[in-house]
Swiss-Prot record:
The keyword Metal-binding applies. PROSITE patterns: ADOMET_SYNTHASE_1, ADOMET_SYNTHASE_2. It comes from the Bacteria. L-methionine binds at E56, Q99, D239, K270. This is S-adenosylmethionine synthase. Binds 2 divalent ions per subunit. Belongs to the AdoMet synthase family.
Length: 385
């Protein structure tokens, strides 16, 4: 028996970097509601009392940027001055230009030119059969802890909870499958009056125990709840936030490789985002079809060129048929050209703000078409299984 451990982390929607991601994707959604094929690359910076937007946007849409920013910040929970960051009073600055025409000429579709990739780059997709949603278990449970913290905070059940929080989960694996929780770290911002003992007890009983599988918790499990002692100063007061700084939280928690490109604030012509979503779709269908227990796909592109420059499959020795056959089936069943994958996943929709917290993958919402396993039956049949 082979025993290993693996750790992944998540952060809450009130974490400064996630505030930035949500604002960037809210801008994208607001534009796509009016102009689905707009070119959007929206970056956000947040710090005490300030939100700054930047990037390149080419669109016919008009969006009240200030109103949108304030709405997002307030909805997250930064809605009064005691938190040091308030959607009603923060400054909103903007420095947004248009997409370079040199980029546009390679990406736009016109006579004798198919839509090309918005940039060069490499993207990965991953799936594993260790959870029902075919995600790595450490990141899956780290996200669920953060969702639970937000649920309790917004419901007022633990009225001392504040928006900023982080989680980290270390799981023990035996022969490639998770069997136990070896460590949990949960840090949550709180109001100053709460007693440390009460906080520890509430986090354990109301957040950790309801989320993590009871059979995985054991006498040796380490619990680190607000290990610095106090966490009153948080959000953009404690740390600056920037779009695209939580790319491992957004994906597979480090269990799979990452091409380096962030997602939030980018329209589907940017393969950093759309091809990573397509990669998840491919990998999940391969695992759902039973062709492998684990699957990682890499795709790469050249700017302005439609066809991927490479497609490769890694199954970590868990394949049930030849990897060469899996690669052949991927090419036959999935159109990974920019235009093809956008159509395949119906990505010209204002669905992106929902992706910007608690993970882009592993949440089977109707809008998240890349989580469907509708290709699994055909893949399995064509593989002869």
């Amino acid at each position: 028996m082979t025993t290993t451990v693996f750790t992944s982390e998540s952060v809450s929607e009130g974490h400064p970097d996630k505030i930035a991601d949500q604002i960037s994707d809210a801008m994208l959604d607001a534009i796509m509601k009016q102009d689905p094929k707009a070119r959007v690359a929206c970056e956000t910076f947040v710090k005490t009392g300030m939100v700054m937007l930047g990037g390149e946007i080419t669109t016919s849409a008009w969006v009240d940027q200030e109103e949108l920013v304030r709405q997002v910040v307030n909805d997250i929970g930064y809605n009064h001055g005691d938190l040091g960051f308030d959607g009603e009073t923060c400054a909103v600055l903007s420095s947004i230009g248009k997409q370079s025409p040199e980029i546009a000429q390679g990406v736009d579709e016109y006579e004798d030119h198919e839509q090309g990739a918005g940039d060069q780059g490499l993207m990965f997709g991953y799936a594993s059969n260790e959870t029902d949603v075919l995600m790595p278990a450490p990141i899956y449970f780290a996200h669920r802890l953060m969702e639970k913290q937000a649920e309790l905070r917004k419901a007022g059940k633990l009225d001392w909870l504040r928006p900023d929080a982080k989680s980290q989960v270390t799981l023990r694996y035996e022969d490639g499958q998770p069997v136990a929780v070896d460590a949990v770290v949960l840090s949550t911002q709180h109001s100053p009056e709460v007693d440390n003992k009460d906080l520890h007890e509430a986090v354990m009983e109301e957040i950790i125990k309801p989320v993590l599988p009871e059979g995985w918790l054991h006498s040796g499990t380490q619990y680190h709840i607000n290990p610095t002692g106090r966490f009153v100063i948080g959000g953009p007061v404690g740390d600056a936030g920037l779009t695209g700084r939580k790319i491992i939280v957004d994906t597979y928690g480090g269990m799979a490789r990452h091409g380096g490109g962030a997602f939030s604030g980018k329209d589907p012509s940017k393969v950093d985002r759309s091809a990573a979503y397509a990669g998840r779709y491919v990998a999940k269908n391969i695992v759902a079809a039973g062709l492998a227990d684990k699957c990682e796909i890499q795709v790469s592109y050249a700017i302005g060129v439609a066809a991927p420059t490479s497609i490769s499959i890694e199954t970590f020795g868990t394949e049930k048929v030849a990897v060469s056959l899996i690669e052949k089936l991927v090419r036959e069943h999935f159109d990974l050209r920019p235009k093809g994958l956008i159509a395949m996943l119906d990505l010209y929709r204002p669905i992106y703000q929902k992706t910007a917290s608690y993970g882009h993958f592993g949440r089977e919402l109707p809008e998240f078409t890349w989580e469907k396993t509708d290709k699994a039956a055909a893949l399995r049949a064509d593989a002869g299984l």
